[in-house]
């Protein structure tokens, strides 16, 4: 099922939670809505679900306007962060609930309901636990039950609101891989909300980065990480360094010195330079580069992270180096140059 939102605006009182949001979602896509708290991602999800009504704008399921439809009429599967399972019901009863409460003219026969539920319980790898109650399950198992329940109604769209937020880190990693496999097998159009960028980049076909009620960028994980279109996206996705620089005759200057980088097609003036901690090379000598005093050094898995104080403006950056290279750079000052970087002029 294709989903399209056009010029959505949502106000709570006088506060605009969403501002002119337009988004096209292809049938069968797995979309991540990613952003910090207050960015509007959960509000957008709730509008698509029908749990909130837009102040302005329209929502389409396929070619039909779904803006005025109820939640039931939209046939949404919704998975909440805290499971929302019925504690007095078994796993099987939880999964079959959505089908059993349908009107008689839309309710499958009892045997079909049971068959569908058992198939889904098997799909989410909980066979043998049909008679257990939620209190007898782990957090990861409860979330699997919640997903099976959402899929039991054969939803037009599957929506997940921070589905792994209440789980510990290792379980989250396991469930991320599992959810991607489930999506590939079922093909439901799926949107999930997260503030975890690693989760979004690993799981999604496309990522929608949101900030202050608006969409900053939509793209594949590679596009979002490698080609951010705004300072916010560059700073929010992954680790990054940010320096206020000056452009003069196509050359980039920092603290009154050229740093060996050129941006020939950019106008002279103030700009902001972004680069990733691992996208640097060490330079012998002190000209045409960034130079700083090492203020901290720590081992992080297979790399060593160095913090550098760059001087007058109290600017500091972090670089990541292989341990063997970092050990040779383990001195009071080092010089470096970004190998991949992006400039935002007038920022």
UniProtKB/Swiss-Prot annotation:
Membrane protein topology class: Peripheral membrane protein
InterPro entries: AAA+_ATPase (IPR003593), ABC_SmlMolc_Importer (IPR050093), ABC_transporter-like_ATP-bd (IPR003439), ABC_transporter-like_CS (IPR017871), Mo/tungstate-bd_C_term_dom (IPR008995), P-loop_NTPase (IPR027417), Sulph_transpt1 (IPR005666), TOBE-like (IPR024765)
Major localization class: membrane
ABC transporter domain sequence ranges: 3-237
GO molecular function: ABC-type sulfate transporter activity; ABC-type thiosulfate transporter activity; ATP binding; ATP hydrolysis activity
Residues the record lists as binding ATP: 35-42
Keywords: ATP-binding, Cell inner membrane, Cell membrane, Membrane, Nucleotide-binding, Plasmid, Sulfate transport, Translocase, Transport
Catalyzed chemical reaction(s): sulfate(out) + ATP + H2O = sulfate(in) + ADP + phosphate + H(+); thiosulfate(out) + ATP + H2O = thiosulfate(in) + ADP + phosphate + H(+)
EC category name: translocase
One of the record's GO cellular component terms: ATP-binding cassette (ABC) transporter complex
Pfam families according to UniProt: ABC_tran (PF00005), TOBE_3 (PF12857)
Signal peptide feature range: none
Matches recorded under CDD domains: ABC_CysA_sulfate_importer
Subcellular location per the Swiss-Prot or TrEMBL entry: Cell inner membrane
Enzyme Commission number(s) of this protein: 7.3.2.3
Subunit structure: The complex is composed of two ATP-binding proteins (CysA), two transmembrane proteins (CysT and CysW) and a solute-binding protein (CysP).
Function of the protein: Part of the ABC transporter complex CysAWTP involved in sulfate/thiosulfate import. Responsible for energy coupling to the transport system.
PANTHER family referenced in this protein's UniProt entry, alphabetically: SPERMIDINE/PUTRESCINE IMPORT ATP-BINDING PROTEIN POTA, SPERMIDINE_PUTRESCINE IMPORT ATP-BINDING PROTEIN POTA
Entry similarity comment: Belongs to the ABC transporter superfamily. Sulfate/tungstate importer (TC 3.A.1.6) family.
Protein's UniProt name: Sulfate/thiosulfate import ATP-binding protein CysA 1
Native species: Rhizobium meliloti (strain 1021)
Lineage of the species this protein comes from: Bacteria, Pseudomonadati, Pseudomonadota, Alphaproteobacteria, Hyphomicrobiales
């Amino acid at each position: 099922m294709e989903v399209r939102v056009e010029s959505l605006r949502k106000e709570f009182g006088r506060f605009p939670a969403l501002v002119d949001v337009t988004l096209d979602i292809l049938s069968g896509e797995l979309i991540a809505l990613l952003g910090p708290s207050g960015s509007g991602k959960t509000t957008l999800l709730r509008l698509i679900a029908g749990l909130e009504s837009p102040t302005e704008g329209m929502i389409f399921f396929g070619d039909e306007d779904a803006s005025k439809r109820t939640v039931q009429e939209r046939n949404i599967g919704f998975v909440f962060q805290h499971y929302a399972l019925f504690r007095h019901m078994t796993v099987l009863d939880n999964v079959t609930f959505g089908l059993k409460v349908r009107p008689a003219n839309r309710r499958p026969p009892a045997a079909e309901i049971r068959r569908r539920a058992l198939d889904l319980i098997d799909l989410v790898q909980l066979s043998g636990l049909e008679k257990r109650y939620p209190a007898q399950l782990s957090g990861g198992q409860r979330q699997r039950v919640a997903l099976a329940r959402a899929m039991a109604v054969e939803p037009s769209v599957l929506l997940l609101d921070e589905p792994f937020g209440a789980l510990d880190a290792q379980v989250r990693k396991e469930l991320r891989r599992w959810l991607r496999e489930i999506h590939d097998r079922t093909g439901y159009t799926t949107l999930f909300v997260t503030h975890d960028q690693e989760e979004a980049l690993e799981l999604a076909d496309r990522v929608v980065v949101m900030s202050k009620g608006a969409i900053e960028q939509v793209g594949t994980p590679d596009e979002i990480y490698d080609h951010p279109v705004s300072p916010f996206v560059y700073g929010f996705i992954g680790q990054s360094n940010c320096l206020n620089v000056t452009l003069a005759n196509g050359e980039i200057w920092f603290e009154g010195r050229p740093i060996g980088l050129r941006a020939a097609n950019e106008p002279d003036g103030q700009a902001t330079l972004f680069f990733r901690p691992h996208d640097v090379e060490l330079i012998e000598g002190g000209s045409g580069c960034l130079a700083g005093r090492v203020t901290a050094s720590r081992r992080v898995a297979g790399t060593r992270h160095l913090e550098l104080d760059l001087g007058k403006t109290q600017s500091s950056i972090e670089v990541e180096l292989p341990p063997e290279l970092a050990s040779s750079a383990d001195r009071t000052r080092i010089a470096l140059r970004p190998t991949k970087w992006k400039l935002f002029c007038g920022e």
